[in-house]
Amino acid sequence: MEDDAPVIYGLEFQARALTAQTAETDAIRFLVGTQSLKFDNQIHIIDFDDENNMINKSVLLHDAGEIWHISGSPADKAVLTTCYNKTSESRVLTCAAVWRMPPEWESGNHESPDDSSNNPQTLELLCHLDNSAHGSMACVLWEPMGDGKRVISLAENHVLLWDLQESSAKATISSSATLEGKGQLKFTAGKWSPHHNCTQLATANDTAIRGWDLRSMSQIYCIENAHGQLVRDLDFNPNKQYYLASCGDDCKVKFWDVRHISEPVKCLEEHSHWVWSVRYNHSHDQLLLTASSDSRVILSNMVSISSEPFGHLVDDDDLSDPEENQQEDKGKEPLQDSIISTYEEHEDSVYAVEWSAADPWLFASLSYDGRLVINRVPRALKYRILL
């Protein structure tokens, strides 16, 4: 059973911002934002043709500045946010804005993708998330499974909850929280939990992970030294409401039950340099991707702490034969965690990895040299999970 070869796409500029087009669940589509100091920056819309194993792309201009973070609306596939660098009065500020793609590009129905590089169209600015009072933006998070009307931005040591009004043409801060403490505190990453009616947020600053209740904008837990060095990324298990994964500059990936934060549930040490990105599969939470500046992407099968630690359980009522019943009991040993694959198509630091929103077995990774690689979960594992 041979697996399909990875598909590689090269951008002409350096890049570190990647997202799946969240609201698009029919086509496999990723958005990549570039980082160029000399030229106008771009957003590449990458369409993956699964049947022919090939990529179609279109390019939109993002002349506001180099892109550090990109995120797609969960409700409107034409709408996205970027965090980008802007120089003003000899200092660099990372700003954030909400944009709309031109109507003919949002659905990927462009006729001749090659022409778009020569005459790229510009994104339509819907509104700025005005951060002049709060400092540089680290990221913008859309409300999971929301209607595209609420976003959170992390700016320096502030959590800002925004309401987007009138087709996202205006953004107002509805509530905020500030991280208090010694020194210059600064958020590095955050994740809006899809559980608890989307009322919780996890943030990372320095080596700590904090949980926030968005109703009261107050802190609900703090894992003080979650990692030995800076925490780079977080992700919530989509199927287990208290479980959270984190990664950092100590080369480790850790799994937490936020009800018992004194120590991690599990720890992985497979990377040899900083781990920049960690992502749970949206459907099968045993599958976990990590990306690192050791230039590798690792797919792990963390089945023991997944929502199905025994695989698919068969109901005892379905087994009429007592002998079969005994054998079934023997088979109910927890399955073993393992590293499934190490993907080594990159030659530079891999800053981002994302699962497709349309195909649960497919993912993209992006390295700083502008190389985007599309890979799949090995077929043997896919069928083992499904059957």
Swiss-Prot record:
The lineage of its organism: Eukaryota, Metazoa, Chordata, Craniata, Vertebrata. The keyword Repeat applies. This is EARP-interacting protein homolog. Residues 309-337 are annotated as: Disordered. Keywords: Golgi apparatus, Repeat, WD repeat. GO terms for cellular component: Golgi apparatus. It is found in: Golgi apparatus, trans-Golgi network. PROSITE patterns: WD_REPEATS_1, WD_REPEATS_2, WD_REPEATS_REGION. One of its GO terms (biological process) is endocytic recycling. The keyword Cell cycle does not apply. WD repeats lie at residues 132-172, 182-222, 226-266, 270-310, 345-385. Belongs to the WD repeat EIPR1 family. May act as a component of endosomal retrieval machinery that is involved in protein transport from early endosomes to either recycling endosomes or the trans-Golgi network.
